């Protein structure tokens, strides 16, 4: 059922239409929506991997959400339209981000995200963004912010020589794709590390401490030397 639902979802988001016919007695489908918003004919989806560098990098309002589809739309043949969003409340304002066109990136206020905004990437523009840790231009990183889960402000910011030391610990980590977190002491502690350059957005990655190991996910699990606890602990 999940495979069929995913296929139908892709039809809705990518083509916006479906040739499937449904009779009046057919049971409605529960659609597993991705976190999207549609504006000016463009489809945008949220991404935890990019964050706003400064609050004042948000520019003018460019639209607002007029309809929330989650738990309302059950027809797999539904055509998304401008103003539709999966989970954003009706009336949510959409903003341009300085340095980007509205056909590339937009922002919405969210006090659980870094610097108070959640970013949505236009689907075709996504391929031009940094998606992997190894793609970060590390020689251009001028600060690293460390955040607790769902906090908008950092509890620690690394600058200067500390940046190189921290990155070296990450780079020297050991790939362990089959690693299973130690749950003997409960859930691991999760932190967010955000790499900032001169660009108006930063790149974020989760790092976790399960009391046995510290690890992160550059593409697959990488276990980092325990020395990194000196940096990530509050």
Question: What are the roles of these predicted feature ranges?
Answer:
Residues 18-234:
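Function-determining sites in protein domains
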Residues 1-7:
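Positively charged n-region of N-terminal signal peptides that target proteins for export
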Residues 13-16:
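C-terminal motif of bacterial Sec signal peptides marking the signal peptidase cleavage site
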């Amino acid at each position: 059922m999940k495979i069929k639902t995913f296929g139908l979802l892709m039809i809705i988001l990518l083509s916006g239409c479906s040739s499937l016919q449904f009779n009046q007695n057919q049971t409605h489908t529960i659609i597993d929506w991705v976190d999207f918003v549609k504006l000016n004919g463009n489809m945008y989806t949220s991404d935890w991997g990019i964050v706003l560098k400064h609050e004042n990098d948000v520019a003018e309002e460019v639209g607002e959400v007029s309809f929330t589809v989650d738990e309302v739309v059950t027809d797999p043949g539904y055509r998304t339209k401008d103003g539709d969003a999966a989970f954003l409340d009706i009336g949510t304002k959409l903003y341009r981000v300085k340095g980007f066109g509205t056909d590339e990136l937009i922002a919405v206020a969210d006090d659980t995200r870094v610097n108070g905004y959640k970013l949505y990437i236009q689907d075709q523009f996504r391929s031009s963004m940094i998606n992997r840790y190894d793609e970060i231009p590390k020689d251009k990183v001028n600060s690293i912010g460390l955040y607790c889960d769902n906090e908008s402000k950092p509890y620690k910011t690394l600058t200067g020589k500390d940046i190189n030391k921290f990155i070296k610990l990450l780079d020297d980590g050991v790939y362990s794709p089959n690693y299973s977190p130690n749950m003997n002491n409960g859930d691991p502690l999760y932190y967010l590390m955000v790499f900032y350059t001169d660009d108006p957005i930063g790149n974020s990655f989760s790092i976790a401490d399960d009391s046995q190991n510290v690890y992160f996910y550059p593409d697959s699990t990488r276990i980092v030397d325990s020395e990194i606890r000196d940096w990530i602990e509050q």
